[in-house]
Structures are given as structure tokens and as C-alpha cells.
Amino acid sequence: MYHQLILMALIGVIMANVVPFSMSNIPEEYKEFIPEEVKNFYKNLTQEDRQILRELASKHATFTNEDAALEALKNKSDKLYQKAVELRNFVKAKIDSLKPDAKAFVDEIIAKVRSLRPEDGQKLDMEKLKQAARDIIAKYEALNEETKEELKATFPNTTKIITNEKFKRIANSFLQKN
């Protein structure tokens, strides 16, 4: 469960620092890849909500688990807490619906992403990120077809992204070893 909050916080940090919290500022060709649930989460965020997410994301190392992080969020904004819980429950239900092989793959991805989190004051190690992406791709390719199909059915927007030719070109150039 803690890993799901980290993913939500990561989404929050990325959205807070890269995307200016306005769906209208996202290029049209990328909007289709954003899950409706994520769009809905960010759709009506206030400036105060965005600031709360930034603040809590910057303190991620101080939270012992997901419940502690959610409690901190609840103390800052009950409305935002409710929205975060709704999004968390949506993600949890999707993961819990998977068969063991697919669930193990998703859990492994989440653990790998968590391991990439830099120490306080440190920057993300891009080479470690690239290697993690290569490892995940290799593990995905090694899955049997039934598991791949289950993942595609459960996470259709992710499938759209990874099968998009433009995305593949960008990812391939990013993942090339220096």
C-alpha cells in the first residue's frame, strides 16, 4: 500500500513541477494517454492543493508508511485526502484484481520504482533509472502471453502508451546506453 502512495506522490511531484496542473496545457497527442481517474484527480485542484502535494512529496522520507502519509494529507486538507484515497482505492482494486503472475510483475515494478527514490537532497540517478527501465522491459518481454494480455486489459492506458510508435522512439533514444 505504501508504494501506491509513493506513486501518487510521484505523480503529484511530476505534475506539480512539470505539468502546470491544467489539462489544457498538455499537448493533445498526449492527453489520450492520461487515465481518466488521474485527470479527474487533478481536474479541480486549487493552488493550495498543489502546494500541499508539493510539500508532502518533499517530505516523503519522513513517512513510515502509506497511512502516515495519508494522515499528514488529511491534516492538511480533508477534501484532498478524500480524493487521494479514492485514487488509491482505484489503483489498489486494479492491482488486487490481477492473477498471481501479473500481480507479481506489477509489485516488482513498484518495488523497483521505489528503490530509485533518491536520498533527501540528492538527484535522481538517470543511469539507474535507465537500467531499471531496461530491466522492467526485459521482464515484461519474458512474461507469457496470457499475463501480458491480462496486463493490457487491466491497464489499457499504459498499453496505449507502450505501444505508441512515437512513445517507443522517444523511449528507445532515452534508454540507449551512453
From Swiss-Prot:
Function of the molecule: Binds retinol. Also binds the fluorescent fatty acids 11-((5-dimethylaminonaphthalene-1-sulfonyl)amino)undecanoic acid (DAUDA), dansyl-DL-alpha-aminocaprylic acid (DACA) and parinaric acid. Binds long chain fatty acids, with highest affinity for arachidonic acid, linoleic acid and oleic acid. These long chain fatty acids can act competitively to displace bound fluorescent fatty acids and retinol. May compete with host albumin for fatty acid-binding.
Organism of origin: Onchocerca volvulus
Membership in a protein family: Belongs to the fatty-acid and retinol-binding protein (FARBP) family.
Glycan attachment positions: 44, 75, 157
Cellular component per GO, a single term: extracellular region
Annotated signal peptide: 1-16
A Pfam family per the record: Gp-FAR-1
Domain of life: Eukaryota
Free-text description of this protein's post-translational modifications in UniProt: N-glycosylated.
Keyword NAD: no
Keywords: Coiled coil, Glycoprotein, Lipid-binding, Retinol-binding, Secreted, Signal, Vitamin A
Tissue spec: Localized to the adult body wall, in particular to the lateral chords. Found in the epithelium of the uterus of adult females.
PANTHER family for this protein: FATTY-ACID AND RETINOL-BINDING PROTEIN 1
Subcellular location: Secreted
InterPro entries per record: Gp-FAR-1
Claim: Signal is one of the keywords in the record: yes
Cysteines engaged in disulfide bonds, as pairs: none
Taxonomic lineage from the root: Eukaryota, Metazoa, Ecdysozoa, Nematoda, Chromadorea
Coiled-coil regions, chain positions: 67-89, 122-154
Molecular function via GO: fatty acid binding; retinal binding; retinol binding
Name assigned to this protein: Fatty-acid and retinol-binding protein 1
